[in-house]
Amino acid sequence: RSTSLLLSENIKQRLDRFDVEKPFDVMAVIDGSTLPNKMPLVDVQATIKNSNLSTTIGEFTNASLKAHFSNQVNLSEQRSDANSRFTFTGCSAIWEKIPLKSDSFNIANLEHPIMDCDLHTAFELAQLNELLGASTIEFKNGHCNADIKYHGVVMKSDTAPASIFGTVNLDNAAIEYTPRNLTFTDCSGSLVFDDKDFIVKQLKAHSGSTSLLMNGSVKNLTSLIDKSPEKLILNLNISSPKIVLSDFISFLSKRVITPAADAKKNSTKKLLKLATQVDKILNDCSVELQINADRLIYKKFNADKVAATLLLTDKMVALKNVLVAHAGGTLQLNGSLTEGPVQNMVRLAARMTNVDVTKTLTAFDNFGQDGIVDKNLKGRLSADINISGLINTKAELDPNSLRGIVDLRIKDGELINFEPVKKISQTAFKNRDFSNIRFADLTDKLEITGSEIKVNRMEIQSSVLTMFVEGIYDVEKGTDLEIQIPLSNLSKRGEDFELKNKGVKSKTGMSINLRARTGEDGKAKITWDPFKHALKKKEKEVRDDKSPANSIKVIRKK
């Protein structure tokens, strides 16, 4: 402190915030008048060896450095704070058990201080947990080494953006993202600071049985980190030989936001601010993922050649341009998952093209119904699907919440031991085998409301007979379907019969009308329906839905 008396009052006040435990060597040159309003040339050199330093950012132990101060860096300009500079070389110390080294550390222009420094360190990542007390991220294990160069302002009042260059290397790290209870293990790779940008380079990680390789960036990190962290976007390209979706099921749970824990007691407000910034960035920033995977697995579902874009915000996961190869065909998908208080809202627009319908039913567990299952149906399915519903944290769909439309087409189709169709032979055409029937292209628009599926008039040209089906299929409340069988079916069909659709509006002539309804035992019953009760019931429900009274009710609900 006695040395600081040689300096101007402004600089002295700043230096007096620092304290050196042991005596150290100082050489000072003062040249010029020390009278009021005069400023002599001041040139000070100091050497500190293996001492402890007390600073505004904590205690540094076993510190060694060489320091130099001059108040006339540019000899052609007057001596002043603006023309002053501190230079530190050969710096080494231990801060909060973390070893630090710096080859060069300069602070110039003490009116509006600008810092230029390099920093080298290596430590165990778990040391950061107690030090920072961040609530969004926890380091379980792993090693870190960093080489950083910084150029920027020191004072809060100076708003010029900082430039950071350098690399942080992670080795065998385990990192938990606590809001989603998601842990990444075996993390190795580089985090690169490139001026204002932050770059993720060749970062390898595992989550469960999924291995990931990540490359990406955050643009303008240093510009937005304080002012608008919500504008930060982490763009990541992720590749994987196999993604197991169940490893990421925690994304269906509500994000848990907890206040930051207190940083280590002897840490400073600056560390608390850093922890708060880390939490705010991870909570507020958006993440855009470009995903490419050789294989995707979820329970019984398997897909190959996976390409997808995911946008993650604090309340939503958006799916864009998802394309996978599945069951010999393709599946395209766009949609969103929006976090709700209890369940999450899912909205999907999908297109299936030429997939094996048996494999697809198996993969999706028969879509939660047991009316027609994978063992009953063969063929190639193409479909346009627009659907919404609620999903819980276990990825289980609430069937009563489903709303949507499915436009489907099945080529080369076969019905195998489908009980409702087999029962037709108990009522009509008793001498025909309904256990295995082939049919022409099957097309229809299905309207889904909860467990109810409205089947619009559908033509089935099969190897056994022609029939037209329409009505309601409902595994919970009961099925009620109208089955029209034209009498042109009276002649049996041979192996060479051409399966060709005539159209749902084609003339059918005289017909037999049957009704398929769910009985009290829960099984389908086929009965004669000469007066078309099933169809009349359906038409009445349509009229009721379109009635003015119902329209008024809808308006009032809004």
Descriptions of predicted regions:
Residues K394, T443, N456-R457:
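Short secondary-structure capping micro-motifs at structural edges
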Residues F439-L446, S451:
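Generic long, charged, amphipathic alpha-helical segments
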Residues I448-V455, E459-T466, E470, D474-E476:
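Extended serine/threonine-enriched, polar tracts that run as long, contiguous segments within proteins
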Residues A293, D441, K454:
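Active-site-adjacent structural elements in folded domains
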Residues R1-A93, I98-K196, T210-R438, L465, ...:
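Membrane-proximal interfacial segments on either side of biological membranes
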